[in-house]
């Protein structure tokens, strides 16, 4: 989403704060007031990726406003998250002015159909919209991820069948008894990976989620093979009808391990939730 030229804005002095764990009640309050489905609109997501994307926030006219930076110079902000007595129009204009004062192009990310409608009601015609295919969320029916029926899931089912024939495993919930094992597994797996852009940021995000598992109120599942944890997944409810999977890691030495933790986590933890947002593509055509 980009600013259309020729629209007036107000001048403000806005201070943005770094996100820390103590801010969870503030974020949870704003996110709870409306039915959000995109994975970015959770405190966990913004907290664990705060270093990677330099995420900061402020409150403007009872709107939660979050800004970020991707790479060296791609600055952006998320749509304001309105409170109970908010002025989205003023919040938007303040964000625009902040970006202009700092010489940043005015770019907003994380737009959904619902937030676009909110923006068009508050500031009609101010923005033009472009599809961001690289950051689509992928939402599945939970029962589909559990049973993997049909041609669409045939490849995943084959991976699981091969896994079951090859390995003896146990599933267990993630908790205080095995968090440290999950941390050590992640560190060990990362040692064997070639350095690629974003890999270190991913490691930081995974470790933040694990080390703050209880405080973030996450749920998790893990697979144990040969006495060691070889896969784990972490998620939470984003609304009463949808869970979001924030983290999914597995030892690729075990064929089908990713497919197996995906299926097992859905079955053991989310079977009573209609939908699962996996944040990004599973590789299903």
Give residue spans per PLM region.
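Aromatic (often tryptophan-rich) hydrophobic motifs at membrane interfaces
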Residues: 218-285
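Short catalytic-loop micro-motif centered on adjacent basic/acidic residues
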Residues: 107-108, 172, 274-279
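Short, Lys/Arg-enriched N-terminal segments with co-localized hydrophobic residues
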Residues: 1-11
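Acyltransferase donor/substrate-recognition loop-hinge adjacent to the catalytic core
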Residues: 123-197
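Short, conserved active-site entrance elements at the starts or edges of catalytic domains
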Residues: 177-228
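Short, charged/polar "capping" segments at the starts of alpha-helices
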Residues: 113-120, 285
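Amide-forming acyltransferase catalytic core, primarily the GNAT-like/NAT-type
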Residues: 11-61, 198
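Conserved donor-binding loop and adjoining core beta-sheet/short helix segment
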Residues: 40-114, 224-252
């Amino acid at each position: 989403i980009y600013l259309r030229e020729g629209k007036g804005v107000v001048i403000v002095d806005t201070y943005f704060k770094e996100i820390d764990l103590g801010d969870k009640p503030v974020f949870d309050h704003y996110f709870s007031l409306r039915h959000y489905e995109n994975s970015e609109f959770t405190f966990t997501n913004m907290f664990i990726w705060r270093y990677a994307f330099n995420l900061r926030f402020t409150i403007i006219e009872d709107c939660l406003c979050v800004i970020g930076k991707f790479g060296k110079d791609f600055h952006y902000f998320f749509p304001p998250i309105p409170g109970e007595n908010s002025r989205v129009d003023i919040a938007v204009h303040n964000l625009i002015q902040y970006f202009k004062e700092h010489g940043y192009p005015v770019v907003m990310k994380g737009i959904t159909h619902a937030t676009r409608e909110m923006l068009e009601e508050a500031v009609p015609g101010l923005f033009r919209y472009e599809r961001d295919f690289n950051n689509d969320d992928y939402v599945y029916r939970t029962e589909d991820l559990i049973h993997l029926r049909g041609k669409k899931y045939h490849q995943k089912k084959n991976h699981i069948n091969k896994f079951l024939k090859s390995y003896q495993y146990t599933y267990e919930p993630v908790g205080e008894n095995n968090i440290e094992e999950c941390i050590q597994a992640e560190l060990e797996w990362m040692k064997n990976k070639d350095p690629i852009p974003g890999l270190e940021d991913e490691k930081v995000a995974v470790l933040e989620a694990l080390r703050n598992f209880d405080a973030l109120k996450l749920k998790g599942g893990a697979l144990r093979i040969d006495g060691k944890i070889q896969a784990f997944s972490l998620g939470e409810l984003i609304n009463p009808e949808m869970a979001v999977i924030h983290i999914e890691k597995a030892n690729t030495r075990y064929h089908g391990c990713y497919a197996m933790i995906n299926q097992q986590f859905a079955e053991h933890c989310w079977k009573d939730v209609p939908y699962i947002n996996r944040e990004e593509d599973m590789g299903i055509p």
